[in-house]
Amino acid sequence: IFQRNALWHSEGSDTVYSPLALMSAALFLDAPLHEGKHVVTAYAGIFHMNYGANYLRYNGIMNPGTSMDPSKGVSSMTGNAYPMFGTGQTLYTQLAYAFAPDVQGRRFQGYASATVSDYQAIEYPVAIVHAGVNWLESAHRSKISLDFENRPTYELSNGNFLQGPRKWGLVLQYQYYLQ
């Protein structure tokens, strides 16, 4: 995707426009094993993103522990947000294994994923790791997931991002597909 003058930033009293450029390549595998009863799934993607000079955006579920005071600057020390979009490159990989379903059609699927990003705005690589299990019921119409996450934290100090301690997260979710 390319779009001229899609983004802007201020330099002094001037408004400077820059293009948006997004490129990616991805591979996907979904292969049945053991006479189709087990399934291995893999995905890998590399993404080059140009949102303009030093663009960086945090993403995370809204959290009352995060301040609404803009003077506090960017921080990932509270809440669960981390840098997810920015000018730079990202490599994302995911591997999952689904075990054979039981007689009621329920099955477990374990998975792990890793995201490593090299953003222009941060001196250090951003590495996020997830691992978890899905419990699939009713031919994947109902799903309970338990996800463990390990992510970096950063503090903004004098215009520079400083690495903080890594933080853990645990998410339990339920999804139901209506037909």
PLM regions and their residue ranges:
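Detector for outer-membrane/organellar transmembrane beta-barrel domains
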Residues: 1-120
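Transmembrane beta-barrel architecture of outer-membrane proteins
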Residues: 20-24, 90-92, 126-130, 167-171
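Outer-membrane beta-barrel architecture
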Residues: 26-28, 94-96, 132-134, 147, ...
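Flexible, surface-exposed loop regions and adjacent strand-edge segments
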Residues: 57-67, 126-130, 161-166
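Small/polar glycine-rich anion-binding or flexible loop at a beta-alpha turn
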Residues: 112-115, 127-130, 149-150
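A generic structural signal for short coil/turn motifs at secondary-structure boundaries
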Residues: 119-122, 155-157
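Internal helix-turn-beta structural module
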Residues: 134-167
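Outer-membrane beta-barrel "beta-signal"
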Residues: 165-179
